[in-house]
Design a protein with these regions (language model features):
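Signature of N-terminal electron-transfer/Fe-S-associated modules in redox systems
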Residues: 1-154
Length: 154
């Protein structure tokens, strides 16, 4: 059985799979990383978004074989309970989630935006998050939280 070594949240992990095209999403869930959600399986909803090599990617569409030797970051690796990432802190303070299903994907996508653009405009935030769907409609709170995390809101 083929074995893939992937570096998840800074830790090398081994994944055994018969299928090199197995989506990264399934491997991450198998490793116990439950922030990564299965939404549509087509890369259209953003619930499965993770950071691979400093880019926001849909893990349901990325074969496990394509991430070998590339750093993968999930929400669990972005911050911790005692030292949350500014986006995590802003989402908590702003009471952004309702059901929470989209939260991980929203935060991971926004984290890449803030790493590339320290003070994004509202239009840039909206453009970056386009394609991350929220069935509860918390888009306004998400936008405010991202602006707060970038130091541009209260």
């Amino acid at each position: 059985m083929p074995r893939y070594e992937i570096r998840v949240n800074g830790i090398p992990r081994l994944v055994d799979t018969l299928d090199p095209n197995q989506p990264l999403l399934y491997a991450l869930r198998f490793l116990g990383l439950t922030s990564v959600k299965y939404g549509c399986g087509l890369g259209q909803c953003g619930a499965c978004t993770v950071i691979v090599d400093k880019k926001a990617v849909r893990s349901c569409m990325m074969p496990i074989s394509s991430v070998e030797s590339k750093p993968v970051t999930t929400l669990e690796g972005l911050g911790s309970a005692d030292k949350p990432h500014p986006l995590q802190a802003a989402f908590i303070k702003g009471q952004v989630p309702q059901c929470g299903y989209c939260t991980s994907g929203m935060i991971m996508t926004a984290a890449v935006l803030l790493a590339e653009t320290k003070k994004p405009t509202e239009a840039e935030v909206r453009a970056a998050l386009d394609g991350n769907l929220c069935r509860c409609g918390t888009y306004g709170r998400v936008l405010r939280a991202v602006m707060v995390a970038s130091g541009q809101g209260t």
